[in-house]
Amino acid sequence: MGEIFVAGVNFKVAPVEVREKLACSLEETKKVLPILKRETPLEEVMLLSTCNRVEVYAYNFVENSEDLINKLLEIKRLNPSFKRYFFVKRGEEAVYHIFKVASSLDSMVIGEPQIVAQFKEAYRVAKEAGTVGKILNRVYEKALRASKRVRTETGISRSAVSVSYAAVELAKKIFGDLKEAKVLLIGAGEMGELAANYLRRFGAKLHITNRTYERALKLVKELSGNVLRFEELKEYLPLMDIVIVSTGAKDYILKREDFERSVRERHYEPQFVIDIAVPRNVDPEAGNVEGVFLYDIDDLKQVVEENLKERIKEAQRGEIILWDEVKKFMNWYESLKAEPYILELKASVEGKEVSPYIKKLVHRAIKEIKRNPEVADIILRIFKEVEKNEPRRKELSNVYNGTHGA
C-alpha cells in the first residue's frame, strides 16, 4: 500500500512573504493539481491554499518528499532555498493534521469558521480535476465529521475573538435583541465597518456619517443604510442606540457634555458607545455618564483575550475528539491492507468443490484478517499449507473411518 502524507507551509513555519509566493488562486489550483499527479509519484492529491497556509494532501507518495516540493517550487518559479520552510507529515500524523486543519484547531484564530468552507472548496476543485480517489475521499468525509463533532461537542466557536465581533457581543448583552436598534457609524475605519456590518446582520438599522460626505455615500452602498451629514452629528446622537466611532481624528469629536445631553433626551435609555479609534475619539469621561456604556479598543481586546483563553481550553477537548476520529479512520485504512488477502482466500473456494472444513477455515481466516490485518500474510501462508494437505487429510480420514467401520 501507499502512504497518506502532507507537505506544505503555514503561518507557524513560514512568514507571510513566503506564503504569498506559494499561494495558488482557484484557477491556478485547477492547473497545478493535474501536473502534481502526472509528474510526481502521487495517486491522489488535493491542495489547500489560504492566506495562512499552502498545503498538499496526498496519497501514495513513496519516494523522497523533495520530489513533490521541488515540483511545486518549479511550478511557482521559486528558488529551491524555499524548501527550508516546508514541513512534511506522514501516516497517522498526516491524518491528524488534516483533521485538525478542517476543525479549525490549527487556525491562527482557533474556531474561525472560514476554514471549513475553504477545505470543502479545495476538495471540490480536486474532485473536478480528477485527482482524488478512494483514500482522499474518505479522508475528506472523516475530516468533515471530525470538524462537525468538534464544533458541536465543544465551545470553540461560541465566543467572539475579533475586536469587531466582540463589540457586537457586548451590544447584544446590553440590548438583547438588536432588531430595530439604531446604529451610528462615525468614520470609515476598517474595524468600525466590520462591527457595523455585523450589527446590520442582526437586524440593526444603520446610519453612517463621515467628514467626507462622498465617503459616507460609498459606505452606504457597501453596507446599506442612511447617510447623515457630519456637521449634524450631535443633533442625531440622541436618536442612536449604538454609536461606533472609527475616524482618523487626533482629538475627541464627542465629549462628556454631548452624551449628558443625549441621555437626557433619551430619558436615560442605555446608549452603547464603541470607540475603536486610535487615538481615541470619545472623551473617556463620557463613560461616567449614567446610561452610557463606553468601550474603547483596549476594553474590547481584553474581552477577546479572555475569549481566546476559553477557546484554547475547548480546543484541548477538541483534540481528544480528533484522535478518536483518527483512530477510526486508521482502522479502516489498515483494513485495506487485508483486501488482497481476503480476495485470494475467497477465490480459493468460490466456484470450487471444497470440504466444509476448508470453507469454515476460510471464514475464520477472513474474520481474523479483518480484526488484525498485520497477520494477513501469515494466515494466508498457513491456509495454503493446510489446503495443499487437504487431500492427504481426507485420505487418512477415510482409512480411519473404514478401519473403525469394519
Swiss-Prot record:
| Location of the active site | C51
Q: Which GO MF terms does the UniProt record name? A: glutamyl-tRNA reductase activity; NADP binding
Under SUPFAM superfamilies, the record lists: Glutamyl tRNA-reductase catalytic, N-terminal domain, NAD(P)-binding Rossmann-fold domains
The record lists substrate as bound by T50, C51, N52, R53, S107, E112, P113, Q114, Q118
Instruction: Answer whether the UniProt record assigns the keyword Membrane to this protein.
Output: no
Function description: Catalyzes the NADPH-dependent reduction of glutamyl-tRNA(Glu) to glutamate 1-semialdehyde (GSA).
Name of the protein in its database record: Glutamyl-tRNA reductase
Native species: Aquifex aeolicus (strain VF5)
What would be the name of the gene that encodes this protein? hemA
